Structures are given as C-alpha cells and as structure tokens.
Amino acid sequence: MREIKEEYDCLHIEISEYIQSPEKTLVEMDAKQEFAFDLYFKRLPVFSNKIREVLKKISIDAYTKIYQRAGDNIRASGQVNSSKFDESKVFLFPSTINKIIKSAHHMARKNSGSCFIVIDAIRNPYEAIFFKERYAGFYLVSINTENENRLAHLRSAHKFSESQIKELDEKEYPSKLAGYSKFVSQNIQKCIEISDIHIHNPREEQFNNIELKCQLAWYVSLIQHPGLVMPTSLESCMQIAYTVKQSSGCISRQVGAAVTDAEFSVKSVGWNNTPQGQVPCLLRNAEDLLRGQDSHAYSEYERNDSKFREVLHGKYDKLRKSPLLEGRNLSFCFKDMQNEIDGEKNQVHTRSLHAEENAFLQISKHGGMKLSGGILFTTASPCELCSKKAYQLGISKIVFIDPYPGIATRHTLLVGSNSPELQLYRGAVGRAYHQLYQPIMPYKDELETLLSIPGNANKKALRTKALEKENLELRDELERLKSQLESLKNEG
C-alpha cells in the first residue's frame, strides 16, 4: 500500500482545498467545475485502477470486500472508517455523483457538445430513487443473466471460490435487512425490482455479445427518440402485470402477474393480496386490533388467541401513540408475528394469495378457459407452490423478472416431460414503458416537418388546379362542338 500512499495524500489535499474553495463569482464557479471534471473523469479513474491492482495482490476478493465495506460506511456515517449511522449522510454517494454530472454538463455546454451519463453501477435502491426523483431522463437498467451463467463468470473471470461466491451473494442479495442497514447496504434484488429497463445478457459465447449490443442499441435509440418502434408483445404483457401489482395490499412487497394464451392475448391478471372479502394488511391497524375495533377486519384467532395477543401487545402497544407515525397506519404482518410465535420460518402463514395463484384462480372463478400452452408473466418469479400450479395447468412459458431465492426452477419446473420454458424478461416496464414508446409527436407529423412533405394545407390549391385543368378541357370541347355545329349549318 506504500506505493499509492503518497499519491493518495496529494489527492486528498487537493480535494480538501477544492471543497473549501469559494464559488461566489462565475469565474470561481467555472474553475471549480473544470477542476471537478478533470479530477473525477481523468485522474481518479487512473488512481482507482492502481488501488484495484494493489488490493488484488492481497487476495482475489480483497478489492470487492474492502470497497463494499467502505461503501456501507460512507452511506452510514459519511466516513470510510466509521459505521455509526448518521441519517444526513445516507445520500452522500448520489449527491456527490450529482455534482460530477453537473461538472460534465458544464464542460459539454462549454464545448458545445452533447452529454450522456452512465453510472456504473448502482447497487443500493435508494440511490436509484434519488436519481429517479431528480432526472426525468434517468433510467435504471438491470443487466441480467441466468444464475448458471453468472456463477460460471465469477469462477472463470474473477477466479472466485465457492465460499467467496456465497459470501458475495449474501452481501449483494441479503435475505433480510433490518434497521438502518436497509438504507446503507447493497441490495441488488431490490434494484432489479425497481429497474426501468431489463437487459438480458445470455453469456453463451465468450467473444460474441451481439445480442447484448442489439438490446442496448434498441433502448439507447428509444431514449434519444421515443416512439421509433412499438413495444414487443413481451413488454406489453409484462407492463400489464407490472401495473396490476400496484393493487396489492401486501406490506412486504408487491407482485403482479398476467396469464396469456400462446398468441399473447391476456386471459387473466392477478396480484398478491388477501382473498376477496378480507381486508388487506395495508389497511389493517394494530391499534384497532388491540382495542377490539373494526372486528370484521381480523380473524377469530387474532381477536381471541392469548399467545398471539401477548406478542401483539408487546410489539405494538407502545408504538401506537408514537409521534413518528405522523398519520401513518400502524399495519402489521401476520406471517412475521406467527412465525415469531412458532419459532420458525413458514410461508404458509401468509394471508395473501400469491399473484400467480390469484391469476390462475380468477380464470376458474369467472367461467374458466383453456390455459394449456399459455404464458405466465410475473414481476417476481413463481415460488415452488405456484410453479406446481403452472406446471399442472400446462403453462408453456414463464417470463419473470426477479429470480426467487428457492428451488422452484431446478426442482419443481425442470422435471418431467412437459417442463415450461423459463425466460428472463427483457424490456421496459413502468414509467419507462410510457416514456420510451410514446412519441413526442405523431411520426407522420415528424416526417412532414423534417422533410417538408406537402401536407393537408395544399389540398385547396391542388383542387383549384384540377378544376382549372378541367375547365380548359371543357372549353376546348365546347369550341370543337361549336365548330361542328357551324359546319352542319353551312352544309344545310
């Protein structure tokens, strides 16, 4: 580390002076922007590569581990060497990146050039939301591949061992985050869930990435020029599933599903929610249950079981009057409470139907129709139970976004003679679907304006010209007839 210590100290002094330097005049502001551009786009990338190489000499995964720990600490405290939580520092990373973006825009304007920014890479969902709230043209892009391809890449390209891969997965795909860890830790699964555009990188051939390039070209073109092409059938159907998930009353996560026939004609939609007639968890209140109010919203078990009410009282009695609620509903998760009572993790206790299950049941509820050969779209991926239902119904393809951390794929679906095809979703969803595929002006109007194609405004002139031509022809015909008539008179 000695080989980079001197350079680090010099950079640290320069950055400290840069932060403290005044920016009261346009000249001072311009100087700071130019310094920031030179620092972040030219000098720091070179220094960062030096750090990477030094850390790799320590161990294969030293760079990843140290940078992940440093990132968590900076989000928590604003300092690399402290994990003490300070809520004012949560958005330090995106705030700094935002300043870097402004310096790039400044230099682009100064040089009369264009400016397109790519941030590689965002692994904290709240940092993504920071940019979504500030830039209408921000798109969170997830590049996904099958898990087998991902593992093979980590083993071959990064030389990771199985234990190192497991440790990396536990860090980037945490099973459960509590407290302030939700704000400072990496959570790639949540980032995938809120992504605007999903790109599929098959990684089937080491030196052939044409499929990846084609997808990137498609969406970069649409970002720069919305409405150039129509959405694919996959995108249209997944957008429906993505839209209906907002109807979910689950307080843990929202999932949507759509079932179509083989021609992408939608037959049913569903979302994770309680059965019809039961109140969703989002609308239930622990205070109401403790006070015995709104009894139809709670089960006989919740109202009368002494052990359950003891746990409920211990968790929520002091919280129901908390000023921090500020009008929020004090909802609670029955599954979590029951699992705490039983001392185990059991998904059976969930009150909600799964989105895929709900979509299947909606079809039978309203008369039924053939689903064999159909396609299931889900904004998550089906669990073991929903996978068995899809298999039994003869679903031929399952299109999913978020890989489920279970054995549904390998155990439940990839078995027997009628296994459905599993396809990672590629396409735009949510806000991006509308922004990318809705043209700013009708394409015909755009071409007419761009190429000066004569439009409807010349119709009157064209009609006048046609009438004038017709009038001349009629005059000629009249003169001919007059001449013939004169000849006949002379002969008589």
Regions found by a protein language model. Name each.
Residues 1-3:
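Glycine-rich phosphate-binding P-loop
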Residues 11, 15, 24-104, 180-183, ...:
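Zinc-dependent deaminase catalytic domain
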Residues 103, 127, 156-214:
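Small-molecule kinase domains that catalyze NTP-dependent phosphoryl transfer to phosphate-bearing small molecules
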Residues 114, 135, 139-140, 369-375:
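Short beta-strand/loop segments at the ligand-binding rim of alpha/beta enzyme cores
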Residues 138-140, 197-199, 398:
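Short, well-ordered beta-strand core segments
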